[in-house]
UniProtKB/Swiss-Prot annotation:
Gene: MOCS3
ATP-binding in keyword set: yes
Chain positions recorded as ATP binding sites: G106, D127, D134, N135, L136, H137, R138, K151, N170, N171
GO BP annotations listed: Mo-molybdopterin cofactor biosynthetic process; tRNA wobble position uridine thiolation
Start and end residues of each Rhodanese domain: 342-443
Keywords: ATP-binding, Cytoplasm, Metal-binding, Molybdenum cofactor biosynthesis, Multifunctional enzyme, Nucleotide-binding, Nucleotidyltransferase, Transferase, tRNA processing, Zinc
Cofactor(s) annotated in UniProt: Zn(2+)
Name of this protein: Adenylyltransferase and sulfurtransferase MOCS3
One term of GO molecular function: nucleotidyltransferase activity
Family: In the N-terminal section; belongs to the HesA/MoeB/ThiF family. UBA4 subfamily.
Amino acid sequence: MEGGGDDDGGRSRAEAIMRELERLRAEREELDGRIRLLESQLRLGAAPLPPSAAAEVEPTGSPSSSSSAAADMISRYRRHLLLPQFGLEGQRKLSQSSILVVGAGGLGSPVAMYLAACGVGCLGIVDGDRVELDNLHRQIIHIEAYVGQPKVKSTAASCRAYDIVVDATNNLPSRYMISDCCVLMNKPLISGSAVGLEGQLTVYHHNGSPCYRCLYPNPPSSPTSQSCSDNGILGILPGVIGCLQALEAIKVATAVGKPLCGRMLHFDALSSHTRIVKISRSSPTCKVCGENPVFTKEDFVNFDYESFTQSPMSKNSTTRSLNLLPENARVSCRDYKKVLDSGRPHLLVDVRPSHHFQIASMAHSINVPLSLLEEKLPLLRDSAREVSSRRDGRQHCPVYVICRRGNDSQVAVQILRENGFLYASDVAGGFESWAKEVDPSFLLY
């Protein structure tokens, strides 16, 4: 009996010890939970919870929503946090920054996607266009189901509310307009461009770097400017430049690294060659950002950037078509259709580049690219003489010139008339008008 009592006493003591261990473990788990929450709050830059609130923290296994959110943030960006040059402070600055991306196309798509993924606090996107099928090979933020829909449902009125602006518009009048706006609002501008197989990138109006007008007080003298719709673009190129724009925006937002201030990056997709060249600092005589600027906010509101650059901001702009010739040197597409239907001998010269001609052309045309026109004048004279021989003794041969949109053809007619082709005429509006007004089956590209 006595031995049995000793056994019962030993079991009671063991059970008491086990209960105490369980209590202490639970208390330790609760304290660990409090510690993790406070550490998370500290990492995210928030003020620590008061003791009364901290005492209400649930033990591990049932974390509070704040603790869960903090842990998710740390888990999501831990690869950033591991970078000694970036770390918690860089992520905190990025999460508190606001960046405006102007353009949601080939450049803006990767910019917006990566800035959002990297944790920018406020991301704005401005774009008035709608998604088109030929956008999808390079504008990776859009999908085919969105064709015809606005690229953004709402547009910011100005860049005033944002810390940094990214120009992803890729056209000349917008480039001037956004740069002027950033100077007037005193915002750094990350500017990139990509056309054909080449791209470039720089940071304007930041740490002494120039604005766009410092480098280009006046637009180029050529009446036409390069664009993706005119010159084409390899789909991946704006992705490369757009990612670099996102990188520069992050560097400016976090003050980490050395942004491309006073330097311009050039990228050649064919050779994969990248070079960085120095550009001039802010010009003291610049009318927008110089020592005595004369360009005011009122000037900005009233300034006609399309007229200034002789270039359109979008394909819907009324300035898209040039007007270089007198009326008697131009015919409408419908009038040219009457010439075709009449069977009168004539010469139709297609001055598009040869690779455009291979995409779609008119069967009776001859292709003489504008860049080769003066070199090929003897060939055209021979062709014109051959046509004249079929015109019932008439000496002159009517020459009609056509291009994609009716701009290059006007330049070509000027050259032809200066070189003796007095009956050369431009087919107004080019193949775009031809497809709309005469032959809807003609393949536009």
